């Protein structure tokens, strides 16, 4: 089973395309939708939904994936639910760059203070970060600086922020999922 979390643009047709691409790894791909506008509510909702899916799951090696803001949540929810994560161009600093897009971006900073301290150290090697050198929305080099101490970084030379085509990375994702 692969759980997919969309980014800030929840209505993007690219979400359906990524789900279809992920089905080449596992036919059981589940999209969880969330508001993107209420961080504390989103965290509670995502934890509940992922836990529910894991309770009914028969896959011994489930995976959670997310793009952009979905990558932010996939890393945290995956850690809390003890499943491996793949993040594409994760938005690691939503409290900085969601200003004006959502009502209370400061909730992201509050969530960070309530999370397990040093969670990335405890999550070491359980997340695969795929970053685009052509990300027009976020500074992928800044993300790499934070993540490379804990996770493998795979660089993509062509995709933009929304990562429309993940197919060149499917074999790597499949191998990562198999490690379970």
Curated annotation (Swiss-Prot):
<dbReference type="InterPro" id="IPR008886">
    <property type="entry name" value="UPF0227/Esterase_YqiA"/>
</dbReference>
<dbReference type="InterPro" id="IPR022987">
    <property type="entry name" value="UPF0227"/>
</dbReference>
<dbReference type="InterPro" id="IPR029058">
    <property type="entry name" value="AB_hydrolase_fold"/>
</dbReference>
<protein>
    <recommendedName>
        <fullName>UPF0227 protein Ent638_1623</fullName>
    </recommendedName>
</protein>
<dbReference type="Pfam" id="PF05728">
    <property type="entry name" value="UPF0227"/>
</dbReference>
<comment type="similarity">
    <text>Belongs to the UPF0227 family.</text>
</comment>
